[in-house]
Amino acid sequence: METIRDLVPPPHIQGIKHFVDYALVDEILRSKHFRQGSHQESQPFFGDSLLTIDHDVHFERRRLQAPLFRKEALEYYEHKELLPLISKALEECKEKRDENGVVRADLCALVRTMLARISAVTTGIDGVDTQERTDAFRNYIEQLGTGATVEWSTEDHGEVISRILQIREGFVKEFYGPSVERRVGLIKEFENGNLSEEELPRDLITLMYLHWNENWDEELPLRESTLYLVASSQTTTHAVPHLMIHLHEWFQEHPEDYEKRFDRDFLKQAGHEAIRLHLPSPALLRIALQDVTLSNDVEIKEGERVACLFTPANRDKTVFGNDARSFNPYR
């Protein structure tokens, strides 16, 4: 069943070259002759973070943060943090059974609650441990996400940036600042020989202050943390409701697959398919570092900005088949 909407290009990418074929988008994104061209207006929130840097600087930052994504770290997060946090969120739902004993919950709100707590742990934000604190934290992250994606906003961009920067001050005072202060104290204990490195928190903020680079400005860890907090929740929060709708429709058309609703491999494939069709960022912009001629003979001048549109590229029939616009968990 085709339930997919097409992308209407927003004003900030009108007037520049658009690339919608999967092969050309892939070529541009892989090319060393382009640099990041997105988030030009959202620099106060993402500037110099992993998402907006290129080449050697990007490689060094990725190497610094690599310990967060090693197998042992991911296993630690899954078993020590992720599963307990999910269980806690589900237990809180059980407390709200109706008179028939049925638990009902708003899936979007539930997923946001789970992801808020998980992103706090991996980034290094303390105190996201009650429903009240989680709601406050989640509101901050959603507001920061508005600032981080200001290019796509239909509001006055200057007003959005000003408003979200004021909101960020509250986030720093309530959550970020105390979390940094505690980690800096623990790092000093480690450097004085009173703690082992294994006793330090396993999160982004700790890594950045433990391996501080004198070329960084004081707010860089805040912007990097903003990237982690926004990105770690946005993709999943955006995809899950779509996934549920697609699965509901799929099971109606393919009742023989209903028994797979708890099959992890099937659900993983379905999740990948939902993300393919519903990426939270519909496009990335790149800037040419030199004159470039693409494989289709299109010429791009040095300094020219181009738009790689993921929505049509991920529905390219030459790559994904004639039913590319439809959900298929077996693709």
What feature does the model see in each segment?
Residues 222-227, 233-261:
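Cytochrome P450 catalytic-core helices
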Residues 2-73, 137-148:
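Cytochrome P450 substrate-recognition site 1
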Residues 1-2, 261-298, 308, 317:
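Conserved cytochrome P450 K-helix E-x-x-R motif and the immediately C-terminal K′/meander segment
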Residues 76-238:
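Cytochrome P450 heme-thiolate monooxygenase catalytic core
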Residues 47-52, 122-125, 244:
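Helix-loop "lid/cap" segments that line or gate small-molecule binding pockets
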